[in-house]
C-alpha cells in the first residue's frame, strides 16, 4: 500500500473550493495514479475523519508561453472528498 502522504499532494484553496466547505466537501490535488479507495483511506488515516464520498477529475494542463516559447503546465488529478456529518478537517478551518 502507498503512503497516504504520497497520495494527497496538497489542498486546493480557491473561491470555489472554499464555498464547498459549507457542504462538508474538501478539495485536494492527489497522485494521478491513485484511485478513489486509496484517496478515501488516505484522508481517513491522515485527518482521522470518516469519508462518505470521493469524486475525482483529471485536469488538463494549460498552454503557456514564456518568451515566445510554447510550454505546458502539468496535468493533475483533483479529488473532492465529502465527509460524514459533524467531521471537520482543521487544516481548512478559519478560511
Swiss-Prot record:
This is Large ribosomal subunit protein uL23. It comes from the Bacteria. Belongs to the universal ribosomal protein uL23 family. Part of the 50S ribosomal subunit. Contacts protein L29, and trigger factor when it is bound to the ribosome. One of the early assembly proteins it binds 23S rRNA. One of the proteins that surrounds the polypeptide exit tunnel on the outside of the ribosome. Forms the main docking site for trigger factor binding to the ribosome. Disulfide bonds: none annotated. The gene is rplW. Keywords: Ribonucleoprotein, Ribosomal protein, RNA-binding, rRNA-binding.
Amino acid at each position: 500500500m502507498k503512503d497516504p502522504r504520497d497520495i494527497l499532494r496538497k489542498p486546493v484553496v480557491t473561491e470555489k473550493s472554499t464555498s464547498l466547505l459549507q457542504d462538508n466537501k474538501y478539495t485536494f490535488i492527489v497522485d494521478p495514479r491513485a484511485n478513489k479507495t486509496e484517496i478515501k483511506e488516505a484522508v481517513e488515516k491522515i485527518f482521522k475523519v470518516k469519508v462518505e464520498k470521493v469524486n475525482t477529475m483529471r485536469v488538463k494542463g494549460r498552454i503557456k508561453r514564456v518568451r515566445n516559447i510554447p510550454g505546458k503546465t502539468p496535468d493533475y488529478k483533483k479529488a473532492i472528498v465529502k465527509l460524514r456529518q459533524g467531521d471537520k478537517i482543521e487544516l481548512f478551518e478559519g478560511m
